[in-house]
Amino acid sequence: MPCQKNQKLSPTVPSREMSPLPDFWLPVFWKNQFRTTIELPTREKYPQVEGGTAIMTGSNTGLGFEASKQLLSLGLSHLIMGVRSIEKGNAAAEKLRKIAPSARIDVWQLDMQSYDSIQAFAKRCDTELSRIDFVILNAGLSPSSFELVPDTGHEVGIQVNHISTALLTILLIPILKTKTSGHRPPRLTTVNSLTAHLCKFPNKDERPLLASFDDPKITPWSSQERYGVSKLLNQLFVVKLCEIVSPDDVIINMVDPGLTKGTNLGGHHELGGVAGALAGAFFAICGRPVDRGAASYTNAVYGHGKESHGCFLMSCEIAPLAGWFYTHGDVLVDQVWNETLEELDFAGAKDIVSNI
């Protein structure tokens, strides 16, 4: 289903079978940000939302909050907000309840820097929910400085944007299979980014790969680079996962909401000085309004069917994966997959995947 004005549906080709995006990415960026208008979702376009149950992580601010507003306006009956701060989540939920007073809105703790929190969240989904129609894994961050997560020893961007997101994905898939409403497969959409295509990935040959991000002497720190490569790792992981999970059971895809103003993800609010001012101006000039970026979430969930399984969606269309998949995917996909499953072995990730 198109979400651009006057957009025509083109023949469906899976992301992995497309030609890669050009290395010179400015024309793609220009088209996305200045030549494409994402239409806001309506009940007529997305009747599937009405009466459903959804999980949205990172839903108290930015794109997650705006997407929650839109979904509730479409008639969503039950929203589970996965948030790190219960206090901030409750404040956001109160605003949402004014928009949809008849909907049930629950605020559940989810700290993506804590394996215990992620496992507890997944367990609640299993024990407390009788139905889950779709999940949007929106929680993510773009740290402005190097930081390790004390409990895991991993750099925080790689931890949250890839490793923890992979864990939650793996834990939720068998749960989703048992919580389907029966007439359509549940959906799981992870938020990804065009920056996965743009990263330089200088440590791609380091082994072990994931651990190489934890030492700036091995992999020099760059905020923009690290955000992009964290999304690349998760993209490669999802591609492999979708070879194992059938779209008849769960439809899994990835969505890029585009550069969006009105969120804190870019980290420019923390920079200060001239750098912060320039970054803020860039977002203000080039960024999509937050409601347009959020509209791409609904389109990813219900604007596409099984043909989007394992695909990367950009401006509401199935788009190529990051260039690294086409040039180094034969090695990197398996490397990322194996190292991630090894990292998550404590949670039984290998057994879960083998029994999906």
Predicted regions and their residues:
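Short glycine/threonine-rich loop-to-helix capping motif typified by GTGT followed
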Residues: N264-G267, G323-T327
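Alpha-helical membrane-targeting segments
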Residues: P2-T37, P220-S222, L259-D291
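C-terminal helical subdomain
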Residues: A279-P320, D330-L332, F346
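Short, contiguous pre-domain boundary segments
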Residues: T37, A319-W324
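C-terminal helix/juxtamembrane-tail motif
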Residues: N338-I356
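Rossmann-fold NAD(P)H-dependent dehydrogenase/reductase core
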Residues: P20-G266, K350-N355
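Non-transmembrane alpha-helical segments in soluble domains
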Residues: I173, V238-C242, T298-V301, W337, ...
